[in-house]
Structures are given as structure tokens and as C-alpha cells.
A protein has these predicted regions:
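Extracellular fibronectin type III
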Residues: 442-473
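Beta-strand-rich modules
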Residues: 427-449
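Short beta-strand segments within Ig-like beta-sandwich modules, predominantly Fibronectin type-III
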Residues: 416-423
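Active-site-adjacent mobile loop/cap segments within catalytic or ligand-binding domains
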Residues: 54, 225-246, 292-370
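Alpha-helical metal-binding/catalytic segments enriched in His/Glu/Asp
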Residues: 124, 140-199, 359
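Metal-dependent peptidase/peptidase-like ectodomains
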Residues: 192-303, 311, 315
Length: 474
């Protein structure tokens, strides 16, 4: 279906001829730096990270209350010090390109926290090189705490190799390979504590990001990404969970979602689709990729991405395809011939490395792309079969062109894309009643932003005619 461009709002000389829509939006030139970074991801390094984290014996958040453990080089305090030292080592290798910090606080007694407990999130910031683009932040995280059968047992062995040394290894490996490059936007590499106690670490960090006014455009949470070696596992798939209706939506926003059928177009859902499109582009062999799951998380479970959702940020969760619950949240033991415990030997390090590559590719794509267009609007002032969409330029000033994407309302992914050039309006010969549209920005190298679904510009109601006062009636 062709698109006709309204050029009245375009930049001088910006005109694009009509041409047919293109199926599969992922067909674009590969960024050689991203390709190089993905080749640098090492299963051996991932394995070393997981083994080191397991060596601390327990990383239960409550082990912070046992000073003897820290003296022995065990427990969560020793673990977080080691994670910080790794970030600092990467920073030294890139001549100080990473800013390494603790987000430290005392968690008051509450659910699964029987006494005041010192928590610390560890993070490293790779600042963007463009003054405006650097305001846009993309974050990868995993939780480094662990637990045995009881979440309040801070003494027993809690190896947590899969849950979640694997996700922490993804965050660290992304930091190691991506810190060798420069990006216009900012990337944060994070490891959080307190997840097993009730998402306390991520909740504190997300709240801090909100209070500081960070423009956090996407959060990639990796939790249980070890590809545990068990019957029924599929090493070619990682699940990506995303919320549909935003938990932070206001009543007015919910009313709009109901009116336009926008239940599957939250910002988190757009991030999930972006991950999928990135996989098609950079993991094109087809031997590994994401399976999009359109719900916030699994049944009876929760994750750190939801802490960011609750603060209004787009966030998704990566999790292995099939979980083995004998190797999660279990005291290490053997019963009736069954080996329980989250042990290193059950982790598939090639699988974790693939998850790290997918995360790294997504982060690098996002941090290289121009910011998404703003004020994206669909004109709905009269009944018509054409669709008019308008938008304002990407705020970082780096976009050189825009694309309109669309899909049937029942389709999970964007199916069509049309280049419309450096314009601010497009008139599409396709009814808005039948499809979902999005607009995204791209730069000269073909890096594409997250798409933005247009909001309707509703018809202005005609005010009722004034009723004459009784004395004026004739």
C-alpha cells in the first residue's frame, strides 16, 4: 500500500516518492561496531563470572547482617564488592569511560526482612557522547542476590547460579564489551540486590531514577537466563515478557486505551518488539532468538522489571524457555535420587552468552539511534478512509528521516514499513480503523528508534447554540 506524503510541514526540499510497503523491517545494513561487540561476548567469561558469584557461598540479602561472612570473603557484601571491582576494571580498560557507583540504602523491617538491612545496588554508567542524546538512557540489569529454600535464611548455601548469577553475568558482560565503544545515548549496567526479599533493590533504584528525572527509555531485566540443562529446554529461545496495559496508567490514559484498542501498544511492548527486530537483524542465523510473551511475568512470580514499570518506565524481562524448579530456591541436597539446588553445573554458558549478545545488540542499537519522534498524532477530526499522521522532530536533532510502520490489529509484531523521508506529516491510503500505526526515526547509518504509536487528535465538539433568556424570546 503506497503512502502519499503531505510536505507542507516538511523540511525544505524534503520530498519522497510513493513506493510500495516493505515487508520485514529488519532488512538494514549491519553496524560493524555492533557486530564486533557481539563477537567479543565470551561464554568463558560468562562462566567465570557465574562461578565467582557462586563462590561467595550465599548472596542472600540478609547475609549483609553477618559481619563474619564478609571477613571470610563470603556473603552478599563480598559479592557486591567484587561486582564493583569488575566494573572498575572495565572502566580502567576504557580509560575511565564508566562511572561506577553504589546505590546504597537501609531497608526497614518488612516482608522477608526481619531487621534493618543494608542493601546496595551496583551500577556503571557509560555516558553518551552527544549532549542531547545522552539524556536518553537505556539500562540492563540482573539481580545478584540469591536464596535457598527460605528467603530469610542468610547462612545456608545459596549458589544461585541461574537465579540470578546468570542475569548478573549478562549485565557485566554487556558492560565489558560495550564499554569499548562510544554511543550518542547513555547506557547503564546494573546489578541489584533484595530481589528475593521483594524487589527492594530495583524498587529503590527505579524510584531514584524517577526522582532525578532520568529519561529512562528502556530497561532490559535478565532473570533466570541460564538455559538450565533440563528435559524440554529449548536452547534457541529466550522468553521476553512485557506488560500490555501499563500499571502506572492514569484513569484518563486507561480510557484512551479502551477507546483506541491500545492494550498491546505500551512502551514496554514496543521495547519487546524492538528486541525481536534486533534479533532478526543481528542474530540472523535463526539458531537463537526471543519468544515474545505478552504478559508482565510468569504466574506466581515477579521480577525487577516491574519495579521500573510501576514508576512509568518501559521495561521487559528475559527468562529461559523452560524452568526447572528443583534448581531454583532450593536448599542444596539430594532426595529420592533427585538433586536439588541452583548449581553451576546446570547452567548452559553458551546459552547465557547468546542472551548477553541479544541484550548488547539491543542496547547498542538503541543508544546509537536518534530519539523517538515526539507529539505523534493521528488526525481524527472527520470521517475518512485515509489516515493522516503528524509528529515533531526527534528532540536530540539527530534524525535524518522517519519511517511509518504498521500491522493488523491482531498481529504481534510490526509487519510493514515505509520510508517517508525528513517530513513531519504523512497521509496514508489505508484506514486507521483496520491497523495499528507507529512512527520511528532513523539516522544516516540506519539506526532506528523505538516506534511511537500516534495518539488521536479528537474531533473538537461544537459548542451548543446559546439559549436566549426568557425576556429575549419572541
Amino acid at each position: 500500500m503506497a503512502i502519499g506524503l503531505a510536505v507542507g510541514m516538511a523540511l525544505p526540499g524534503a520530498m519522497v516518492a510513493q513506493k510500495p510497503a516493505v515487508k520485514n523491517a529488519a532488512n538494514a545494513a549491519l553496524d560493524p561496531h555492533i557486530v564486533s561487540a557481539l563477537k567479543d561476548v565470551s561464554p568463558a567469561r560468562v562462566k567465570a563470572t557465574v562461578e565467582k558469584l557462586v563462590s561467595f557461598g550465599t548472596r542472600n540479602t540478609l547475609s549483609a547482617n553477618d559481619p563474619e561472612l564478609a571477613k571470610q570473603g563470603k556473603g552478599i557484601v563480598a559479592a557486591r564488592e567484587w561486582i564493583k571491582s569488575e566494573f572498575e576494571r572495565y572502566a580502567a580498560a576504557c580509560r575511565g569511560c564508566l562511572e561506577v557507583s553504589y546505590d546504597q540504602f537501609t531497608q526497614a523491617p518488612g516482608r522477608r526482612v526481619p531487621q534493618p538491612t543494608d542493601l546496595a545496588n551496583v551500577y556503571a554508567i557509560l555516558r553518551g557522547t552527544d549532549a542531547e542524546a545522552a539524556k536518553h538512557i537505556y539500562l540492563v540489569t540482573g539481580h545478584y542476590d540469591s536464596m535457598p529454600t527460605s528467603p530469610t535464611d542468610g547462612k545456608s548455601a545459596a549458589p544461585g547460579a541461574n537465579d540470578d548469577a546468570s542475569g548478573t553475568a549478562v549485565s557485566l558482560e554487556c558492560a565489558r564489551v560495550l564499554s569499548k565503544y562510544k554511543f550518542p545515548a547513555t547506557i547503564i549496567f546494573l546489578a541489584v540486590a533484595g530481589e528475593e526479599q521483594g524487589l527492594y533493590g530495583s524498587a529503590h533504584f527505579a524510584k531514584m531514577a524517577k526522582e532525578k528525572g532520568w529519561q529512562l527509555d528502556a530497561v532490559l531485566n535478565n532473570d533466570i537466563v541460564g538455559g538450565v540443562k533440563t528435559a524440554g529446554q529449548d536452547a534457541s529461545i529466550v522468553r521476553v515478557f512485557s506488560e500490555g496495559v501499563p500499571v502506572s496508567a492514569t484513569e484518563e490514559q486507561l480510557r484512551m486505551l479502551r477507546n483506541i484498542g491500545g492494550e498491546s501498544d505500551s512502551s514496554s511492548r514496543q521495547v519487546a518488539r524492538y528486541v525481536r527486530e534486533t534479533a532478526k537483524k543481528y542474530m540472523a542465523k535463526g539458531d537463537f532468538g526471543p519468544k515474545l510473551v505478552f504478559r508482565r511475568d510468569r504466574y506466581l512470580r515477579g521480577g525487577d522489571h516491574t519495579s521500573f514499570n510501576e514508576q512509568g518506565f518501559a521495561a521487559v524481562r528475559f527468562t529461559e524457555y523452560r524452568e526447572d524448579y528443583t534448581h531454583q530456591h532450593q536448599d542444596v541436597r539430594t532426595e529420592n535420587g533427585i538433586e536439588y539446588g541452583d548449581l553451576v553445573k546446570f547452567v548452559d554458558f553458551d546459552y547465557v552468552a547468546n542472551v548477553a549478545r541479544l541484550n548488547a545488540a539491543t542496547l547498542a542499537q538503541l543508544a546509537s539511534a536518534p530519539a523517538s519522534p515526539v507529539n505523534v498524532t493521528m488526525v481524527t477530526e472527520k470521517l475518512e478512509n485515509d489516515t493522516t499522521i503528524t509528529w515533531d522532530a526527534s528532540p536530540d536533532g539527530r534524525a535524518t528521516a522517519y519511517e511509518v510502520v504498521w500491522r493488523p490489529t491482531t498481529a504481534p509484531e510490526w509487519e510493514n514499513v515505509e520510508a517517508v523521508g525528513d517530513v513531519r506529516m504523512a497521509v496514508l491510503k489505508r484506514s486507521k480503523d483496520n491497523v495499528v500505526f507507529g512512527v520511528r526515526a532513523l539516522d544516516r547509518q540506519g539506526h532506528r528508534s523505538l516506534p511511537v504509536v500516534p495518539q488521536p487528535k479528537m474531533r473538537q465538539a461544537t459548542p451548543p447554540a446559546a439559549t436566549p433568556a426568557p425576556s429575549e424570546k419572541k
